[in-house]
């Protein structure tokens, strides 16, 4: 997920003050800007959650890089796969 953030987001800063309720999960919080939109993401392994989206919204989080790219830049599945492949190069 970090490779994708680096590839698609203009700015990203890790919040080193963030502490998770389950330290063994390895969750990390990032403040990112992508296409002039702000996101506050928690990344835990291959899962992610956008804290700035209403908790009852259906698109608040997901699993994997493709879902993350679709959320960050608002593109469809096929386009997101291409972006992820570019990020992996």
What are these regions (language model features)?
Residues 1-89:
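N-terminal structured subdomain of primase-like DNA metabolism proteins
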């Amino acid at each position: 997920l970090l490779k994708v953030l680096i590839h698609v987001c203009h700015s990203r800063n890790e919040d080193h003050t963030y502490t998770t309720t389950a330290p063994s999960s390895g969750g990390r919080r990032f403040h990112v800007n992508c296409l002039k939109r702000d996101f506050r993401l928690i990344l835990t392994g291959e899962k992610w959650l956008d804290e700035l989206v209403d908790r009852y919204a259906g698109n608040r989080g997901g699993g994997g890089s493709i879902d993350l790219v679709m959320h960050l830049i608002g593109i469809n599945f096929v386009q997101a796969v291409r972006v992820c492949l570019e990020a992996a190069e």
